[in-house]
């Protein structure tokens, strides 16, 4: 495998910064730094584990490393957050300055990586103890050596809560049950029971069905919920075009396009106040999981770790027979386009 330029850049930057820090004096008697810099859904589903870390070390002692654009979410959840700007990931001098300030200001005694993988951040945190999952992906396995203690997941294909349980047991040094780290954030969000919210995007295009297929699902929604409005949410040009196509395919229907018209927390509120959520593998699907909001998840493969098996969520995947009738150059994935209207209708009926 050829290493991507970004990984080579990160490796060189981290090595040079690490060498520079050998000439700096940092104390290691200060805060607990917790790395949680990946996606929205990951942050939400790990919220109970985050609470347990705070309980163990005290809120005033625990700081979460998060990407700048997720800082508001972390603070909303009650965390002390250190924002990591995107520019600092690419610029050597910005990264050097940021890492120096973090080590100097917070004097970390422990670095806990609660993500499901590893990256170059671990190399430049100067802490007495650095604990996290050992990531054997070719491009990042070089960073495993910076841990003072690392571990592997018991089963690489296990469900996401089992992975979080593995992380929790290793960094908290306690035996845990899945129930111990089951997140419940209903108390954080306003809850209601009106409208149907559809998230029209995901982290990858092949996880999103064609608007032609979504049109058929929406027609089923209106049969069962004729009085409800449908609200489309998402962000970015691709999702704006997707929503536009849906409205063109279903004129004169009660469909409201909120794509690119809400910030993250406003989109969260639309979901938690809804009667039902429909979406692909995404942060909003995980929001339903942590708030017990009824929802339908559309998956290429329902065995993936993030397909939560709980009563308030119905996960539906492709039929055994692949449907090749959907012709869409923008959304051509045959698996996601093979989720039958019948299975969607059945999921609607079960959640009603």
Where are these regions (language model features)?
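Positively charged, low-complexity intrinsically disordered leader regions
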Residues: 1-29
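Active-site donor-nucleotide binding/catalytic segment of nucleotide-sugar enzymes
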Residues: 34-38, 134, 183-242, 301-303
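Short amphipathic alpha-helix
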Residues: 43-54, 69-72, 217
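Conserved nucleotide-sugar phosphate-binding/catalytic loop shared by glycosyltransferases and other
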Residues: 60-94, 254, 315-322
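Short internal beta-strands
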Residues: 61-68, 131-133, 230-235
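Conserved nucleotide-diphosphate donor binding/catalytic pocket of glycan-assembly enzymes
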Residues: 83-178, 195, 199, 204, ...
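Donor-binding and catalytic core of enzymes assembling or modifying cell-surface/extracellular glycoconjugates
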Residues: 93-99, 213-300
């Amino acid at each position: 495998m050829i290493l991507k330029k970004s990984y080579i850049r990160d490796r060189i930057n981290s090595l040079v910064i690490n060498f520079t820090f050998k000439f700096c004096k940092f104390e290691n008697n200060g805060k607990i730094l917790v790395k949680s810099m990946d996606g929205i859904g990951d942050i939400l589903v790990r919220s109970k584990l985050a609470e347990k870390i705070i309980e163990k070390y005290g809120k005033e002692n625990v700081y979460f490393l998060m990407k700048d654009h997720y800082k508001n979410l972390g603070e909303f959840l009650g965390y002390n957050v250190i924002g990591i700007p995107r520019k600092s990931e690419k610029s050597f001098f910005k990264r050097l300055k940021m890492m120096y300030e973090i080590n100097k200001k917070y004097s970390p005694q422990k670095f806990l990586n609660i993500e499901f993988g590893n990256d170059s951040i671990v190399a430049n945190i100067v802490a007495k103890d650095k604990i996290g999952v050992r990531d054997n992906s070719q491009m990042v396995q070089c960073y495993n050596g910076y841990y003072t203690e690392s571990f592997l997941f018991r089963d690489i294909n296990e469900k996401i809560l089992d992975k979080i349980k593995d992380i929790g047991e290793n960094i908290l040094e306690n035996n845990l049950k899945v129930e111990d780290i089951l997140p419940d954030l209903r108390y954080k969000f306003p809850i209601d029971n009106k409208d149907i919210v559809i998230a029209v995007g995901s982290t990858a295009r092949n996880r999103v069905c064609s608007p032609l297929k979504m049109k058929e699902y929406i027609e089923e929604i209106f049969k069962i919920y004729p009085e409800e409005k449908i609200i489309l949410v998402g962000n970015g040009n691709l999702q704006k075009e997707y929503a536009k196509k849906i409205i063109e395919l279903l004129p004169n229907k009660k469909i409201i396009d909120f794509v690119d018209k809400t910030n993250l927390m406003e989109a969260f509120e639309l979901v938690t106040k809804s009667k039902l959520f429909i979406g692909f593998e995404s942060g909003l699907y995980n929001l339903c999981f942590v708030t017990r909001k009824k929802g339908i998840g559309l998956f290429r493969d329902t065995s993936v770790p993030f397909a939560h098996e709980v009563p308030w969520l119905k996960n539906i995947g492709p039929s055994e027979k692949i449907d090749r009738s959907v012709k869409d150059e923008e959304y051509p994935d045959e698996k996601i386009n093979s989720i039958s209207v019948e299975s969607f209708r059945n999921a609607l009926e079960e959640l009603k």
